[in-house]
Amino acid sequence: GKYGTGLLFLPKESKLQDVILSILIEEIEKEGLTLMHLRKVPVNSSILGTDALSTEPDIRQIFVTGCNDQALLEKKLYLIRKRVEKKIRQTNAEIRQDFYIVSLSTRSIIYKGMLSSMQLRHYFPDLTNSYFTSGLALVHSRFSTNTFPTWSLAQPFRLLAHNGEINTVRGNRGWM
């Protein structure tokens, strides 16, 4: 499309958000693009468990425009994400801890969190809004077994959803 969109996990503190957003805007402008809109994603925090609620990030959605070539825009968004992540890694731990770019793309939007698959649509009202349509939806509901659960480590990842056990084709055929 002619725009890209992304979901961001941000710290709750507005001063920390301002630092992150200034880095993000700087990188967007370096690519000759424009941050068209910044939206607070509506959520229903009342359904969260204690651990998820205590670590819940502020979730924002961005819309980026300025390039009519979808493939080129996708590449620019990838570069922006990588540079922003690198700059944030070089900041203080307080900013790094609660920051994560969930998705930034012309092709997909990822909604995720420390939620069960049944909680997902109740937590994100966007997912039950009739104005939002999708040709494909992927839901991954397995919890991590070898890492401490966090919002950023929730499945799916940007390009992959799996249970941590990527086996060989031959091995999978043997089990069929």
What are the residue ranges of the model-derived segments?
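N-terminal segments that mediate ammonia production and transfer
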Residues: 1-176
